[in-house]
């Protein structure tokens, strides 16, 4: 049986990480960990609570943004494309971890519960351990792309070729296994070496979750109108 046509969406260089060793003793980290009754090294770095500590880190102004991953995943997993089994989503982090996400996964809407889930994932390597709806592996972005083995790679980039979303959907539809890479950081450029056709969907920079929505919806109609009977 031939493989089903799917979009492979990668949130790359995501600012999702546990607290780095060099700031474990910072008061902002220690106090937050005490309130949560967790060890400092087990908590997820979050600029909302750890802003003072981030000033001591390289790239501190862009780090500690698990909220970006949270919103992107909520939107992607609840999309029609995912419900029709035409989407696979991955998260690649700044420290070269990859989160594999089963399409049936339903993430917590509540942000604090999501943070708790991510902390469990980084500690255990899979959650829940018996089902592995989320699985964490050490892997570079390029290793992930090689593993997916797409027939086309597109990188969403503000310096890319300007293309309206509808036309980008038509372009994606020309391939059976396209991969789209979206930066999971608030500003700046990719840290990882990223190869692919650079595409921009708007004349101004957009947040990652907006790009996720535009990419999915642009591809959604092109694919679903051909394969689904639910909309006829």
UniProtKB/Swiss-Prot annotation:
- Cite the CDD domains for this sequence: Nep1-like
Q: Which UniProt keywords apply?
A: Methyltransferase, Ribosome biogenesis, RNA-binding, rRNA processing, rRNA-binding, S-adenosyl-L-methionine, Transferase
Q: Which reaction does it catalyse?
A: a pseudouridine in rRNA + S-adenosyl-L-methionine = an N(1)-methylpseudouridine in rRNA + S-adenosyl-L-homocysteine + H(+)
Q: Which GO terms describe its biological process?
A: rRNA base methylation
- Annotated site, Stabilizes Arg-65, chain positions: 67
Q: Which residues hold S-adenosyl-L-methionine?
A: 183, 188, 201-206
Q: Where is this site: Interaction with substrate rRNA?
A: 65, 106, 109, 113
Q: Write the Enzyme Commission number(s) for this entry.
A: 2.1.1.-
Any single GO molecular-function term of the entry would be: rRNA (pseudouridine) methyltransferase activity
Pfam families with a match to the protein in the record? EMG1 (PF03587)
Family, as annotated: Belongs to the class IV-like SAM-binding methyltransferase superfamily. RNA methyltransferase NEP1 family.
Which NCBIfam families would you find in this protein's record? PRK04171.1-5, PRK04171.2-2
Please name the PANTHER family in this protein's record. Answer: NEP1/MRA1, RIBOSOMAL RNA SMALL SUBUNIT METHYLTRANSFERASE NEP1
The record's subunit annotation is: Homodimer.
- Protein name (database record): Ribosomal RNA small subunit methyltransferase Nep1
Q: Which organism is it from?
A: Pyrococcus abyssi (strain GE5 / Orsay)
Protein encoded by which gene: nep1
């Amino acid at each position: 049986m031939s493989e089903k046509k799917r979009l492979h969406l990668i949130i790359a260089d995501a600012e999702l990480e546990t607290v780095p060793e060099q700031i474990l003793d910072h008061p902002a980290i220690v106090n937050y960990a005490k309130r949560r009754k967790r060890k400092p090294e087990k908590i997820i770095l979050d600029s909302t609570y750890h802003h003072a500590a981030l000033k001591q880190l390289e790239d501190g102004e862009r780090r500690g943004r698990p909220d970006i991953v949270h919103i992107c995943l909520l939107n992607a997993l609840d999309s029609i494309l995912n419900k029709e089994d035409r989407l696979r989503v991955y998260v690649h982090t700044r420290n070269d971890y990859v989160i594999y996400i089963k399409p049936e996964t339903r993430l917590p809407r509540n942000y604090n519960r999501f943070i708790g889930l991510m902390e469990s994932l980084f500690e255990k390597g899979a959650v829940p351990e018996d089902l592995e709806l989320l699985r964490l592996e050490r892997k570079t972005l390029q290793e992930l792309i090689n593993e997916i083995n797409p027939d086309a790679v597109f990188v969403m980039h503000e310096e890319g070729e300007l293309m309206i979303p509808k036309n980008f959907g038509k372009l994606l539809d020309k391939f059976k296994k396209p991969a789209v890479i979206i930066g999971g950081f608030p500003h700046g450029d990719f840290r990882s070496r990223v190869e692919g056709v650079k595409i921009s969907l708007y004349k101004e920079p957009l947040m990652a979750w907006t790009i996720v929505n535009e990419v999915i919806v642009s591809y959604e109609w092109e694919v679903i109108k051909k394969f689904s009977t639910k909309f006829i």
